[in-house]
Amino acid sequence: MFRKLLVILLIGLAISCHPKLNPIQQQIQSDINRSEVFKNNFTGLVVYDPVTKDTLVNINGSKYFTPASNTKIVTLYTALTLIPKQIEALRYMTKNDSLFIKGTGDPSFFHPFFKDSTLYFFLKDKSTITLVKGQLDDDHYGPGWAWEDYDAAFSAERSALPIYGNVLEVIHTNGVTQFTPDYFINRSQMTAFSMPRKRANFTNEFYIPLRENDTIQVPFIQSDTLTSRLLSLALNKEVRLMPPQNDVVFDQKLYGMSRDSLLKQMMVVSDNFIAEQLLLNASSTQLNRLNSRDIRRFVLDSLLSDLQQKPRWVDGSGLSRYNLFSPISMVQVLEKIQQNSEHYLEFFPIGGETGTLEHWFNGTDQPYIYAKTGSLGNNFNLSGFLITSSGKTLIFSFMNNHYTQPSSVVKKEMGVVLRRIRDDY
């Protein structure tokens, strides 16, 4: 009898000591468990109230996920913290009548979207210009990037001094074809047929489909020699090349366009090239060298040393499947952005209105989702800020990996969960 009573007491004690889930956690957990869509996914969701410091929902929050372009959230934080409001566009030294220059990774020079000409107007009146080569202390491609994407616009090469966004842009309208830069006209074949590839694998030979009212962007293979040639043609004067020398010290800086304008483009349309180059620019600013690996290590060891789960962070854009982040870590980075930027919502796509969220997660009367998407094959993630019906701003990270159904199905089911959080809290 005594033994039975003891067992009953122990069971009661265990039940009373077991942490109770809050109502929102219980409801969301139930929704996800019952969902046929999430049934075979690897799903993680963390919802956090930055005012009360309460974690409202935590489902697999400490597990690692492939973040895809959610990685750009960490690049955003890095750039906001390390890059000045006007981006450093060039470093240079003047000696007698000669100008020696090196790149800082600034992606804006003649970029197809920005078409920034700060560097052009700085250089056009200089008599003797020498580009010091060998400044990129990194690979042109990130680790784990898919080789088959080499001719895709979203996979442009990284470089020390980008020009034209490191892509050939071909616009065909009303029977007229325009090449930018036109240096590649004689290296391009126009074809009425669809070719397997738009560029040769190891050379800058292009195969451009001839389609009316079409714009095509194809990455070109970067080199210091090509950069000096394109600069020479743009400036209509010779730009020489030389290796680094000890007596050439880059003691002056040229500042270019607004950092925040670049960041908004990176986040809203999920521009991989801008993300990669801003990471290199942060490296130039902080470490005086262009090395993506070194600046990531610096950020993880200093600015993000308090993350609960140390990420595996291998590039600036999220193109690599080697990246691994937990939902909790993503929420922590988002909170840092919120704390350090007064206009933080302006950097994020708006549900139902802009960028990668233009057709998804729209509100009823007004937007309620401001978040970054992250898409790779079989993966879709959404991390950012959720405005509840009661007016509270929550931080969330909703990650879905390893599904086989269409992403549209997963997005719709995520919308059901996010609307419940909006309406119930």
What are these regions (language model features)?
Residues F2-I8:
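Sec-dependent signal peptide recognition
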